[in-house]
């Protein structure tokens, strides 16, 4: 069974935990309890393939920012979440993306931009703005509601598909590189 390491990032209070718990446990948590770091595992079938999702739900609060590098190193794909009623959380996405690229030392990291809380009438981030940002990053954009479960699965499953494409690209690039021999080094003590 293929395992996918997904990391949910974004500012505090945007609904990262609510999205994750909605996917894992099928219920909405409406009380806000700031996360330090929680890990969840769920077996799902995506496009006919049985997968194990290893989801890391992270702290949005600045006081935990020192922990970010560590979980960004281990993650394969990132859900970059903002709240559609919080412009600052949308502006913060740029910082998360830059940090991910720096830690992964790559321009090409599987990501999905997620605009959460689309059930709320008090929108401050226009859908077009978010679509344009996602297009400029070359990543998908999905609006979700953790409360109503709208497109929650879609967000996570789209990220898995992005990781699959990334893995395939990486394999074909390695096969096309002429004269490259993988050398594995072992140290026996």
Curated annotation (Swiss-Prot):
The gene is Kras. Its EC number is 3.6.5.2. The keyword Protein biosynthesis does not apply. One of its GO terms (molecular function) is GTPase activity. Alternates between an inactive form bound to GDP and an active form bound to GTP. Activated by a guanine nucleotide-exchange factor (GEF) and inactivated by a GTPase-activating protein (GAP). Interaction with SOS1 promotes exchange of bound GDP to GTP. Interacts with PHLPP. Interacts (active GTP-bound form preferentially) with RGS14. Interacts (when farnesylated) with PDE6D; this promotes dissociation from the cell membrane. Interacts with SOS1. Interacts (when farnesylated) with GPR31. Interacts with RAP1GDS1. Interacts (active GTP-bound form) with both SHOC2 and PP1c (all isoforms) to form a tertiary complex; SHOC2 and PP1c preferably bind M-Ras/MRAS, but they also bind K-Ras/KRAS, N-Ras/NRAS and H-Ras/HRAS. Interacts (GTP-bound form) with MAPKAP1/SIN1; inhibiting K-Ras/KRAS activity. A lipid is attached at residue 186 (S-farnesyl cysteine). A lipid is attached at residues 182, 184-185 (N6-palmitoyl lysine). A motif (Effector region) lies at residues 32-40. It catalyses: GTP + H2O = GDP + phosphate + H(+). The modification N-acetylmethionine is found at residue 1. The modification Cysteine methyl ester is found at residue 186. GTP binds at residues 10-18, 29-35, 59-60, 116-119. A lipid is attached at residue 180 (S-palmitoyl cysteine). It comes from Mus musculus. This is GTPase KRas.
């Amino acid at each position: 069974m293929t395992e996918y390491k997904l990391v949910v990032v974004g500012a505090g209070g945007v609904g990262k935990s609510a999205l994750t718990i909605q996917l894992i446990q099928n219920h909405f948590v409406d009380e806000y309890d700031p996360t330090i770091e929680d890990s969840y595992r769920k077996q799902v079938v995506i496009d006919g393939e049985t997968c194990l999702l290893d989801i890391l739900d992270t702290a949005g609060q600045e006081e935990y920012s020192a922990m970010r590098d560590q979980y960004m190193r281990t993650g394969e794909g990132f859900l970059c979440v903002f709240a559609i009623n919080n412009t600052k959380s949308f502006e913060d996405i740029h910082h998360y993306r830059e940090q991910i690229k720096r830690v992964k030392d790559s321009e090409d990291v599987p990501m999905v931009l997620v605009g959460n809380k689309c059930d709320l009438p008090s929108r401050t981030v226009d859908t077009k703005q978010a679509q344009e940002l996602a297009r400029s990053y070359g990543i998908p954009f999905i609006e979700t509601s953790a409360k109503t479960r709208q497109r929650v699965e879609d967000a996570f499953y789209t990220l898995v598909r992005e990781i699959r494409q990334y893995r395939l690209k990486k394999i074909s690039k390695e096969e096309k590189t002429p004269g490259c021999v993988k050398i594995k080094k072992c140290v026996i003590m």
